[in-house]
Amino acid sequence: MDTEEKKKTTASVEHARMLQNEIQQLFAQLRDTNSQIRCDLNEFEQIKESSTTADSTTNSAN
């Protein structure tokens, strides 16, 4: 392998590593976002359940 090929190969490997790093960062962000969405959804479900319970309590009192 001559010097020019080695330079191209090295550049390709460095670029691949950079892309892999970016992908790992994006997956980490995706996991964080997914976790936040799940937390928000759970909170919403709890609010919805308590609202439904409050409505049924109010309706049965009437």
Curated annotation (Swiss-Prot):
It holds the Pfam family YLR146W-A. Keywords: Coiled coil. Residues 14-49 form a coiled coil. It comes from the Eukaryota. The keyword Coiled coil applies. The lineage of its organism: Eukaryota, Fungi, Dikarya, Ascomycota, Saccharomycotina. The keyword Coiled coil applies. This is Coiled-coil domain-containing protein YLR146W-A.
